[in-house]
Each structure stands twice: as C-alpha cells, then as structure tokens.
Amino acid sequence: MVVCLFSACNDDDDDKIPQGPAITYAGKLPSRIGDYTFVYDDNNRCTQVKNNSYVYGEIDYDKGVVIMDDEEAKVSFNSDGYVTGISASWNYNEDGYSYKGSGKISFSYNGNGQLVSYTESSSESGKEDGESFSSQGSYKATYTWKDGNLIKVVTKEESTEDEEKYEYGSTCTIEYGEEKNELGQYTLGQAKVLDMEDADVFALGKASAYFPVSYTEEYYEKDSEQNYENEYSENMTYVLNTDKTIKTEYINGSPYSYSYVAIDNDSDNLKVRSLLPSDKKNLNLRSFFIRHHGRK
C-alpha cells in the first residue's frame, strides 16, 4: 500500500474513537486483488495490506495507531470512516547511519464522500557514510470529479536536500466506458491512479460511478542535472461475477484476479486471514514518509 491505512487527527476528530470503514460488496470483502492481500478483523475492517510476504502496515483500531515495523503512527477517521491523515516521527541510529525526522499527511473529501486532496510534508536530518545531510519535502495531489467519476489527478512534489532542489509533477486524465459500477467498487487501476491500494477496501472515499477504461499520465521531473518530460498510459477491461463484483481486471492485457471472502459472523474465515507468513517483511515509517523525496 503506498499505505493509507493511516491518519493524523484533525480538530473535528479529537474526541472520536477510530472506527474505520466496514464496506462490503454484495455481502463480500475483497481478500486478494492481484498480488495484494487484505486482512480484516471481526468487525470487517481492513487491518492489514500485504503484497506477497511484504507487509505495508497493520492498524490497531482500539489504540488508534498504525504499526509499521514495530513503530506507531497515530490514526483517525472522519465520521464516514475514511482516512483523514497521518503523522509520525522516527529516530534511527545503526551502523554509522542515523536518520531523525517527522512527517504529516492529510486527506480531505467533498460532501459526496469523494477524495479531493492529499497533502504531505516531511523533514529529516542525519548521517550517511559519515556525511551529514538535511532534507525537506512536500507533496500535493488534487482530484477532480465530474458526474460521479474521477476524471483528473494533478500532483506536485518538491524536495530539497542540502540546498539541492528536486521537483516532480504529473497530470493524469481518466476515461470511462458505459458499464456502471453498480456496487461502487474501487478498481486496481483507479487505486494505481491514487497511488494508494487502500482505496480497494474503501478507506479513501467513494469510487467512481462507472468503470474506468483508460488513463494517461503526463509527468515531468527536474533538478540541477535534468529537465525531463514523458507520458504513460494504461487501458483496463473487466470481467464481472454474476453478483456484479469484479472477477478479473485486465490492465494493458495483463489479468489481475479478484478473490473475496463471504461475511459470516459465525465463521473463523476472517481470523484465519490474519495469520502472517514467517518470512514477512515490513515497511517502516521513514520509508513511507520519504517516498516522495527525490533523494539519490
């Protein structure tokens, strides 16, 4: 997940106990989409996202924290159960390398429960190979909706390390077909546009009203050595189950299968999915917060 199992409290959420989204599609929860596996608690809330054995993070709703590699970030939700932000700090010192920093992320939604903005800021200082460094970074994404569909995403990333500046920006446009998304299910393609796989379990607001069939991303990056521009596009098609859930999504012709677990309050199915492989790997807080830094 370029995870967004996280959230930092805003003023409106200070007195609320984190609940988290518990959304089902035709009485089922997505258990696997492509290489991503989703783990749920007894209240049908997603507690973990994995990519094969790689664990992006685990959420403790009772404590209101996300746990990444035994570290905690505070988490909260708005009244609809959608993630509203993240804040955390880190301090590592090992084998001559040291990193001390902090980061904050916030999400906002419109009155229809659709994600409209994502902002991120972080700063860090430390030593690598005996050399000191300091860096700051910011990232902002804005989302434009029309007729219930996400049609455009604009991002801008800026970072500075020891006075050297880096900038990255992109504009992504999304096209839709005539097939209605009757269950309001997030697709893998749309989650990729958001750069956050948590969208697949409804943690980031409502999905588009129709199934997206393509997106085109124009992007640039520049620093002291380059000024680069390029374009990238993907096409999506779908095969649905009889209950209108997605069975297979094809992205540029490659199939991504969807698996589900039926909701049964008397079953241990959801608990069983919480078991982790012995070779699991974890994303730490620092890796998550500096992923938008243009560090070399």
What is each stretch, according to the model?
Residues L5-A8:
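C-terminal motif of bacterial Sec signal peptides marking the signal peptidase cleavage site
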